[in-house]
Regions:
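Glycine-rich phosphate/pyrophosphate-binding beta-alpha loops
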Residues: 61-63, 192, 247
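Non-catalytic positions within long, well-ordered alpha-helices that form the structural scaffold/packing
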Residues: 177, 258-261
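Alpha/beta catalytic cores of group-transfer enzymes, especially the acyltransferase/condensing modules
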Residues: 10-12, 39, 97-245
Length: 293
């Protein structure tokens, strides 16, 4: 029996996240305070009692979701047989699997968030969810539209998120509706994540990831770029860099984990988005979501 731990990405955040850990677990409180110190601002104030607007800023959201996931895992003392994360969650998975220290993971996540926010401001873009079409059909629609628009998140069968320049994404949504999509709706995100518009962020992050000390994880970490399990630190680093402009292949991560013998999934962090997606990949699999102790 193999137990996989999975970690959400941006979009799962909610005001109040992690507060019970801070209030009830002294070791968790210590880590949250260490995070405030590393980040140079009190992220806990925003996480526990800020506004949705404050929490929604990429530079805040990403470290906040990372902190909730990782501190939750540490409080539970989890020992994963396999790990994976959705987009930002890739970093949470690597820290929980022991490939990266808490401090180094947080520094990279903060750098990634700021680089992505800067890229969004430099080249405004958007993302949209396309529901009810085959992946191949959506890929062909993206290829047929003028301007930058690509498949960005393969979330579950029949749910693919596209990303790119605003006009191109809107044009692809119209074509998707004409092709019979159940829904094609813009997402409330700050930019075109996992698309070529993130190239400046990728260049910004490359050096920081290359210089960060990574170790061999205690279990395979299934990474976003190709949904395969990795334990080699050099390959893990390359995948984290590539991930910024490449799609998140979540459907395929879940399928690969199942075919590699994973029998149980636990999602750690805010919300239960991944729990829902995993059930859509395989309705019979055992999956739970934990956002509080």
């Amino acid at each position: 029996m193999k137990h996989a731990y999975v970690f959400p990405g941006q979009g799962a955040q909610a005001v109040g996240m992690g507060k019970d850990l801070y209030d009830n677990v002294p070791a968790a409180k210590e880590l949250f305070e260490k995070a405030n110190e590393i980040l140079g601002f009190r992220i806990t104030d925003i996480m526990f009692a800020g506004t949705d607007e404050e929490l929604k800023q990429t530079r805040v959201t990403q470290p906040a979701v990372f902190l909730h996931s990782v501190i939750m895992a540490k409080a539970l003392g989890v020992k994963p047989d396999a790990a994976a994360g959705h987009s930002l969650g890739d970093f949470s998975a690597l820290v929980v699997a022991g490939a990266l220290s808490f401090e180094d993971g947080l520094k990279l996540v903060s750098k990634r968030a700021m680089a992505m926010q800067a890229a969004c401001e430099a080249q405004p873009g958007t993302m949209a969810a396309i529901l009810g079409l085959e992946d191949k059909v959506v890929e062909e629609i993206c290829a047929s539209v003028d301007g930058v628009v690509v498949a960005a998140n393969y979330n579950c069968p029949g749910q693919l998120v596209i990303s790119g320049a605003v006009e191109a994404v809107d044009a692809a949504c119209e074509k998707a509706k004409a092709a019979g999509a159940r829904r094609a709706l813009r997402l409330p995100v700050g930019g075109a994540f996992h698309s070529p518009l993130m190239e400046p962020a990728k260049q910004e992050l490359e050096k920081a990831i290359a210089e960060a000390p990574f170790q061999t994880p205690v279990c395979p970490v299934y990474q976003n770029v190709d949904a395969k399990p990795y334990t080699d630190p050099a390959a893990i680093k390359a995948n984290l860099i590539a991930q910024l402009t490449a799609p998140v292949r979540w459907t395929y991560i879940v399928r690969n984990m199942l075919s590699d013998g994973v029998t149980e999934f636990t999602e750690l962090g805010p919300g239960s988005v991944l729990q829902g997606l995993i059930r859509k990949v395989d309705p019979n699999t055992v999956v739970e979501s934990k956002s509080t102790l």
